[in-house]
C-alpha cells in the first residue's frame, strides 16, 4: 500500500527527515512511533500532499505522490493533529459540505454521512452545532469527515492527543473496527501501550530515520528475547537446578522459593528443548515463560542509543 524510500526534508539548518524508509502493507494498522521532533508529522504531511520533500520516493497504492497528487488525494483520508472545524455549522451540514467536495450530493450524501456518524457514535448529534461538541466528539467528527470518500489509506496524526481516558478508549475501539473492516491505517501516536494492542505493525522513527520496523509478533519476539526466563517448579527443584547450571544458554540463576529466574541466551527452540529436558528428568514444571517486556521499554532503549549516536556525530 505505502512505500517510502530515502525521504529527506530540511527546514533551514534542521534535517527533519534524513533518509527515511518505510513499508506499510495493504490492510495493516501501522503504528508510527517516535519522540517529539523525530519527523512524524513532517512525514504524514508529505503523504497527505501538504509538503514537498527535498528528495526521496513515495508511492501509495502504486501511485507516485508527486506526479499523481490529484488522484492520490481521492485515495487518502487525513486527520491532522490540529484540525479546523466550522463551528457555525451543524454536524450534518459539516459532513454534507465535505461530501460535496468529493462530488457526493443529495440522498447519497445524506445516507453516507449518517452511516459514518453512526460508525463514530455521533448519530444523535446530527442537529447539534459543531461548536457545542466536546473535544473528543470533534475528533470523532473529523475522523468521519476523513472517511467520507472511502479512502484506501487513512492517516491519523496523534488522534488520541488531549483525550480523557474514557474518550480515548472509545476512539481506539472505532479504529479497531476500521482495522477489522480491512482499512489500511497509518497512526502516529505517543501512547505506546495502546498501539501495542491496536496495531498489526509498527515503525519507530528517530532523528528522521527509521530505526525499527516489523509486525507486532516480530517486535515482541525481539522485546522478550532478552528478558529473563521464568520457571515455577512443583517438585524436584534440586534436580532442575543441576540441569540449569550445566545448560550452555543459562547465564544467571536466581531462586526465590519455587520460582527460578534465568538469564537465558537462547531462542524459542532452545527454550522448548530445555523444557523437554526438565520434563524428561521428571521435574514437574508448573509454569515456563519469558518475562513480558513492553513497547515502552524497547522504545526507550532504541531512542537512547540513537541519542548517544547523535551526540557522538555532533562532537566529531
Locations of regions flagged by a protein language model:
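Conserved ABC ATPase "signature" region
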Residues: 96, 100, 107-125
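ABC transporter nucleotide-binding domain
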Residues: 172-265
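Hydrophobic anchor residue at the start of the ABC signature
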Residues: 143
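Conserved ABC ATPase signature
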Residues: 129-133
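Conserved catalytic motifs of ABC-family nucleotide-binding domains
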Residues: 150
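Catalytic Walker B motif of ABC-type/P-loop ATPase nucleotide-binding domains
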Residues: 154-157
Amino acid at each position: 500500500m505505502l512505500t517510502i524510500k530515502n525521504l529527506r526534508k530540511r527546514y533551514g539548518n534542521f534535517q527533519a527527515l534524513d533518509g527515511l524508509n518505510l513499508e506499510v502493507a495493504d490492510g495493516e494498522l501501522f503504528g508510527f512511533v517516535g519522540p517529539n521532533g523525530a519527523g512524524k508529522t513532517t512525514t504524514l504531511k508529505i503523504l497527505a500532499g501538504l509538503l514537498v520533500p527535498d528528495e526521496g520516493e513515495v508511492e501509495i497504492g502504486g501511485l507516485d505522490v508527486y506526479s499523481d497528487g490529484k488522484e492520490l488525494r481521492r485515495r487518502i483520508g487525513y486527520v491532522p493533529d490540529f484540525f479546523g472545524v466550522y463551528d457555525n455549522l451543524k454536524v450534518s451540514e459539516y459532513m454534507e459540505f465535505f461530501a460535496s467536495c468529493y462530488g457526493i450530493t443529495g440522498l447519497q450524501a445524506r445516507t453516507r454521512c449518517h452511516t459514518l456518524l453512526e460508525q463514530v457514535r455521533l448519530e444523535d448529534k446530527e442537529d447539534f452545532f459543531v461548536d457545542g461538541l466536546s473535544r473528543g466528539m470533534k475528533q470523532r467528527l473529523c475522523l468521519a469527515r476523513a472517511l467520507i470518500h472511502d479512502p484506501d489509506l487513512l492517516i491519523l496524526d496523534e488522534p488520541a492527543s488531549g483525550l480523557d481516558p474514557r474518550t480515548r478508549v472509545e476512539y481506539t475501539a472505532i479504529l479497531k473496527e476500521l482495522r477489522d473492516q480491512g482499512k489500511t491505517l497509518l497512526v502516529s501516536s505517543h501512547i505506546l501501550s495502546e498501539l501495542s494492542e491496536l496495531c498489526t505493525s509498527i515503525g519507530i522513527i528517530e532523528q528522521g530515520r527509521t530505526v525499527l520496523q516489523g509486525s507486532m509478533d516480530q517486535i515482541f519476539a525481539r522485546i522478550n528475547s532478552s528478558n529473563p526466563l521464568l520457571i515455577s517448579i512443583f517438585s524436584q527443584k534440586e534436580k532442575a537446578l543441576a540441569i540449569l547450571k550445566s545448560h550452555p544458554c543459562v547465564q544467571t540463576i536466581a531462586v526465590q522459593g519455587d520460582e527460578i529466574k534465568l538469564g537465558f541466551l537462547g531462542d524459542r527452540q532452545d527454550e522448548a528443548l530445555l523444557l523437554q529436558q526438565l520434563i524428561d528428568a521428571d521435574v514437574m514444571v508448573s509454569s515456563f515463560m519469558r518475562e513480558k517486556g513492553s513497547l515502552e521499554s524497547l522504545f526507550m532503549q532504541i531512542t537512547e542509543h540513537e541519542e548517544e549516536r547523535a551526540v557522538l556525530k555532533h562532537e566529531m
